[in-house]
Amino acid sequence: MDMVNCKKSGFVKKVTTDRNKIIALLKSAQRKEEASNSLPLSFIDSKITLLYDSLRILLEVLALKNSLKIYNHECYTAFLKEIINESRLGDEFDKFRKLRNALNYYGKEINVKEAQAVLIRMKNFIKRIRELN
């Protein structure tokens, strides 16, 4: 889905920037990342889900700083590609979104080696989004 369709569908709306909300969201993202880091690798689904939540919240902050509210995770991909001009990050986020959905909704299992690689990629993604914020 592209930004035009996201806006037409009501999944992206113009908003005024709310500094207090941004501060609260940044704290929430940090707590989720810390919670993920505190879990042992045996809780891999939870670690990945928490990191995904953290990075999605950081994307929400980035969108708010661009006066946008995004109501659909797929539209964050379009936001990264079309508004932020970071196509690679958009593709990477979409992979994380699909993996998280597969783990949470379809019972996908992931081996430890693959999980460790995903966690590293997610942490690098979070670092990059923080740099953009």
Task: Indicate where each model-derived feature is located.
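Terminal alpha-helical segments
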Residues: 1-133
